[in-house]
């Protein structure tokens, strides 16, 4: 059990770091870094927007940057769960807070997400996203 707990803790820390790096790129509009976190066969399921893929996901950040939006994402403390997917990678589940200024007022929303991460050649990429509870 100790080895499993240690491996699980290590995986948790690894995915938490990947999440942090991904959304630092999102928050700073670092498109080149951001797009490297997604597999080109990405499937993104959204409870309001339906199913989209890699191009829509990348173009969203590109448009956000072009519009000079101040949209920011922050992981909700204590919400992160990470589970191994043997032979593939990991499942990340949590809640995140998005904020931006609209008409001079701070707008915010907390939503739930599930990311499926695949580890290939020591690199983590998200292959599936489920974004819900909007």
Question: Each predicted region: which residue ranges?
Answer:
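A generic structural motif
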Residues: 45, 99-101, 132
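Exposed beta-sheet edge and beta->alpha loop/turn motif
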Residues: 88-121
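Short, low-complexity N-terminal intrinsically disordered segments enriched in polar/charged residues
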Residues: 1-40
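Residue-level detection of beta-strand scaffold positions
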Residues: 22, 29, 33, 58, ...
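Short, conserved clusters of charged catalytic residues that mark active-site
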Residues: 10, 17-18, 74-77, 112
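Residue-level signal for well-ordered, solvent-exposed loop/turn and beta-edge residues enriched
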Residues: 50, 105, 123-125
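Short beta-strand edge/turn micro-motifs at domain boundaries
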Residues: 1, 110-134
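A solvent-exposed, acidic/Ser-Thr-rich amphipathic alpha-helical stretch
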Residues: 14, 31-88, 95-97, 107
